[in-house]
Structure formats: C-alpha cells, structure tokens
Curated annotation (Swiss-Prot):
This is Probable kinetochore protein NDC80. Belongs to the NDC80/HEC1 family. Acts as a component of the essential kinetochore-associated NDC80 complex, which is required for chromosome segregation and spindle checkpoint activity. It comes from Yarrowia lipolytica (strain CLIB 122 / E 150). Keywords: Cell cycle, Cell division, Centromere, Chromosome, Coiled coil, Kinetochore, Mitosis, Nucleus. It comes from the Eukaryota.
C-alpha cells in the first residue's frame, strides 16, 4: 500500500484534522446498500454495510470511544465456524496469506517486532498481541488499547461482530498456542480479509464487478463528506464550492449518459416513428375516454328511465284498483237506498192502517225523546258515581300497597340490624313489638271508623316505635364513636410501624451498599489474583468473610423487614375492615331509621285523614241514596 493510501487511515484523535478511516464501534448500522465487490465472508459483508462509521457520539472530533463508553448489549453468537481451521493445509494457506499481508504493509518497520514463518506457526503471547493490535488499528486507527489482552480481544471482536466468537475463550487468550492457535489464526485471517476488502472499497477497486451506479457513487461521496464534517462538529454541512461540484457531477453524468447512448444507439428514424406512434395512440386514447364517459352517462339515463317507467306502471295499477273499489261501493250505496225506500213505504202503510194522525205521531216522538234524555242523564249520573267510587277505591288500594311496602322495608331493615348486632353484645336488638306491625285488612267493613292503633294491631308508632328507635340510634352513634377512636389508635400504630419500616429499609440499603462495595472489591481482587494468587489469598479470604457477614446481616434485616411488613398489612387490613363497617353501619342505620320513623308518623296522619274522608264520603252517599228512595 502506498504512502498516500496510508495517510488516509489516520486516527480520529481530538485535534486531528483528518477525517479518513474513522472508528466504527459504538454506532448502529444503517441500511445503505453496499457497493458491488469481490466475495468476502458473511461477517465482512455485514461489517462493510456499516461503511466504516465512527464510534464518536459527540460533535467535536475525537478518538475511538470503544472501551470508554458502555457498549450496546448484544445477543450471544452461537454460530459454528464452518471453516476447516484444524486442517493443516488450510492452516498453512491462511498463515501464508497473513504473512504476505504483514510483510506487504511493513509490519516489522512500524512495530519494530521481528516477523517470520515461525511467528505464525508457533507464536508467543507478545507476538499475538503485537499482530492483533497492529491489524485492528488498521481497521480502527483511533482505538486505544488500555485493558489486558484477554479482555481487549473479546471486547474488540464483539464490537467488530466476529461471527465465531464462541470458539475463543478468555482462558485461551491468556495462553495462545497449542491446540487453540488454529482458531486464533482463523480470527487473524478474518481481520486481514476485512482490511483487504475495506481497502478495495476505498480505492474503488471492484475486481471486475460493475460496482455502484453513478447515482449511488455521487450520493455515497456526498454522504461521506457530510459525515466527516459532522465528526468535526459541523452540524450544517455546506460546501463553499457546492455549485462547482454540482456542475462537475452534472457534466460527469452527461458524459456517462452520452457513452451509454453511443453504446446502445437507436436505428435512424426509429425515434421519430415511435413519437408519431405515441401521439396517435394518445389521440385514440382520448377518444376512448370520451366514449367511456358517454357510455357511462347513457347507462345512467337508462337506469333512470327504467325506474320512471316502473313507477308509472305501479301508479296506473293502483288507480285501476281504486276505480274498481269505488264502483263496488257505489253499487252497494244504490242497493241500500232502494231498500230504505221500500221500508219507508211499508212503515207509512202500517201507520195509515193503525189510524194514527201525523200530530199524534209527532207527540209520541217528543215523549219518547224526552224519556230517552232522562234515561241518558240518569245513566251519566250513575256512571259518574261509579267512576268516583272506582277512583277512590284505586286510590285507597294504592295507598295501602305503598303502606305495605313501607312496612316490609322497615321490617327488613330491622331484621338486618338484628342480624348485624347478633355478634356484638354492646348493641341491643330491636324487640319484635317494635317492628312487628299487622294491618289486619284496614279497608274491610269491620275496620271502618276504628282508631289507627287498633288497625295496626295495637301498635302506636309515635309513642312506642319512635322512642325505641331514637334510643337505639343513640347507642349506635356511641358505638360508632368508639370504633372511630379505635381506628385512630390503629392509625397511630401503623404510622409507628411505618417509621420502623423506613429505618429498617435504610439500614438494609446501607448493608446492600456495603455488600456491593465488598463484592466490587472482591471482583477486583479476583481479577488481579489470576496474576498473583499466592500473594492476595489471605486478603481474599478476609473479604469473603466480611461479605458472608454482610450477607447474614442483610438476611437478618430482610427477615425483620418481612415481619414488620406482615404486621403492617394486618394492621391496615383491620383498619380498613373497621372503617368499612363503621361507615356502613352509620349510613345505613342513620338513614333507614330516621326515614322509617318519618314515614310511619306521616303514614299515621295520612291514614287517619283518608279514613275520615272516606267515612264522610260513604255517609254522604248513603244519605243521598236514602233521600232518593224517599222521593
């Protein structure tokens, strides 16, 4: 590779003006179509689709951020390596390709590290580290290697999406060589192929393929320049020579278009013939569209005309049936008129045979009309009386039904109260004499004129039921107050338990923080213990004991927390239960008892008034009937 190509692959460190070959790790891949190039491995093709994008996330030029920022979690790769990496012939082939690549690109001069065939067949840990870092820096020049080699290799290959990462473990990276070197040489060969493919792409060397189209090439060129400007902190990329570049691209496009026309010329005169044929077809197509529109309008007119004809036929049929019906009615009326004329002649003949004069007939008619009017007036009076009696009876029945419903609701409420206080000795039950009310058919004849207390079975709602209900209501109110005080006491206890729970949670948080710090310390010691295990064994045991002690303290605190949570849940459950019972008892008893008392008092007054009115109405009707009989 020449020096100019090598200069294009500089790092994206801060302050560096070069924007070529930026880092690729850390950014999501776009769906830009890759250019056509020679075949490569699936992972190489996948990585090429990212177009060598940088890992930078900010607006200022910076170095590679891989290893400095958290990487996006990826699903583990479980693809089996299809390459025959354990085959000796294949190993020799890929080792030769790696060696040629390293020699061609001046590996020894840049790294000051010796290189020979033995280095690729039986390498040391330092050989592998030097080759790996040098090859990957050609992929990502801005990447800094800070961690140990076993951590760096895994992280770098995961970021580069090496498809067979499962075949390489950290323990194998610590001791490169032996049986595992076949997989490491395959990994280095994959990185060499990746570098080779990227270099061909940047040098527009598509090895006989068509490559990207002119439009794609122009777009990709502008996208690369815009992206590099974005990495340098320019959010609004605008080239100062935009018009000149546009003119150059247009000239390039016209030149390629002329070449394509020269390679594929049309026969002489064929273009004019095609234009004439197109004009003729367009004229025919306009006539066809007009014909289609005319046919559509005619079809609509035919449909409308058919609907009009059907409507007229239906109208004519309806008129014919009406005419036949009118003719039949006219014949019936004519026959009835003739029949009435014959009956009139017969009646006149009968009257003449009886010897009655017209004056006598008129007098008889007047008497008959007067008697008929008198009968009609009597019938109207009787109907009015029946209507009044029916209305009074329906009103009395409606009042009786309403009273019966009120008494049933009152009895049901008292029974519900007695069932509720059955388990509580502090509240008394309502005696049967208070809520057992029997109307004993108040509308029967034997109850006419009786006192309401007699009709209600000897129960006086005002002097017996109301005082008892007021006394029980006062007792229920005192019970509700006692339950409210108990609920306040439980609320105070719950608040105390909550404060204890908060303190326990704070203590648990401190213990968890201490445990987390100890765990982090232990992990750090375990990482360093792989290099110096004998020296740090005593410290590790001491930290493990502290960690176990912290875990035991955490378990004890968690058990105490669970106990407090159980007690808190029990107290909250008891408080909710008491609150619901108090609220239900207070609302139900206060409303139902007062409502029933008011209804019973109003019912007593209403029944007395209705019975007196009904008695006066019956007495008036009886006296009127007696006077009518005397008359």
């Amino acid at each position: 590779m020449n020096a100019s190509a090598h200069k294009k692959r500089l790092s994206m460190m801060p302050g560096t003006s070069s924007a070529s070959r930026p880092s690729m790790a850390g950014l999501p891949q776009r769906n830009n179509p890759p250019p056509q190039r020679e075949p490569a491995t699936p992972a190489v093709s996948e990585l090429m689709r990212s177009s060598r994008r940088s890992m930078a996330f900010g607006r200022n030029p910076r170095q590679s951020s891989f290893g400095l920022v958290p990487q996006t979690p990826m699903a583990p790769m479980h693809t089996r390596d299809p390459r025959p990496v354990r085959d000796r012939h294949y190993q020799q082939q890929i080792s030769q390709q790696i060696y040629e690549y390293l020699v061609t690109n001046h590996f020894e001069q840049e790294t000051r590290h010796p290189l020979n065939q033995r280095t690729l067949s039986n390498p040391t840990q330092k050989d592998f580290k030097t080759m790996f870092e040098w090859i990957f820096r050609r992929i990502d020049p801005g990447y800094p290697f800070h961690k140990s080699i076993e951590n760096e290799v895994h992280a770098v290959l995961r970021a580069a999406k090496y498809p067979w990462l499962d075949s390489i473990t950290k323990s194998q990276i610590v001791a490169v060589g032996g049986q595992s070197w076949a997989y490491f040489s395959g990994m280095l060969h994959w990185m060499v192929e990746l570098n080779t493919t990227i270099e061909k792409y940047h040098n527009h060397d598509y090895s006989g393929d068509d490559g990207p189209s002119l439009v794609d090439e122009i777009f990709n060129r502008h996208a690369r320049e815009s992206y590099f400007a974005y990495l340098q902190g320019d959010d609004r990329f605008a080239r100062p020579d935009a018009e000149l570049c546009l003119a150059e691209e247009n000239a390039e496009f016209q030149e390629i278009l002329a070449e394509q026309r020269a390679q594929n010329p049309l026969p002489e005169g064929e273009d004019d013939e095609l234009d004439e044929e197109l004009s003729r077809l367009e004229a025919k197509w306009g006539k066809i569209e007009e014909a289609k529109l005319l046919g559509k309008n005619l079809a609509d007119d035919i449909v409308k005309l058919g609907a009009f004809v059907d409507a007229r036929k239906e109208h004519n049929a309806r008129y014919a049936s009406q005419m036949s019906q009118a003719t039949a009615e006219e014949d019936n009326v004519t026959s009835e008129v003739e029949s009435l004329s014959r009956q009139k002649l017969k009646l006149q003949q009968t009257i003449q045979d009886q010897g009655l004069s017209p004056a006598e007939l008129d007098k008889l008619h007047l008497d008959m009309e007067r008697q008929q009017k008198a009968l009609n007036s009597l019938d109207e009076i009787i109907d009015e009386g029946r209507q009044v009696v029916s209305n009074k009876e329906s009103t009395a029945l409606a009042v009786f039904d309403a009273l019966d419903r009120v008494i049933k609701e009152y009895t049901s409420s008292v029974l519900s109260y007695n069932a509720w206080v059955a388990s509580d000795n502090d509240l008394p039950e309502i005696p049967e004499s208070v809520y057992l009310i029997d109307l004993r058919e108040p509308l029967s004849e034997e109850n006419l004129g009786r006192h309401p207390s007699v009709i209600l079975g000897g129960v006086d709602p005002r002097n017996q039921i109301r005082p008892e209900i007021v006394r029980i209501c006062n007792m229920v109110t005192s019970k509700v107050k006692a339950l409210q005080e108990e609920a306040l006491r439980l609320q105070e206890e719950i608040e105390t338990n909550q404060e204890k729970l908060v303190s326990q949670k704070r203590h648990i948080g401190e213990l968890e923080a201490k445990s987390r710090r100890l765990r982090e310390t232990r992990n750090a010691l375990e990482d360093s213990a792989s290099m110096n295990e004998n020296e740090n064994s005593q410290n590790t045991e001491r930290l493990e004991n502290q960690f176990v002690q912290a875990q035991s303290e955490t378990a004890l605190a968690q058990s105490q927390l669970k106990g407090l949570q159980v007690r808190l849940q029990d107290a909250e459950h008891e408080r909710n239960k008491l609150s619901v019972e108090v609220q239900q008892a207070r609302e139900r008893l206060s409303q139902d008892i007062l409502k029933q008392a008011e209804v019973m008092v109003a019912f007593k007054a209403m029944v007395q008034t209705k019975l007196q009115d009904f008695e006066m109405f019956v007495r008036a009707n009886v006296e009127e009937e007696i006077r009518g009989d005397h008359n």
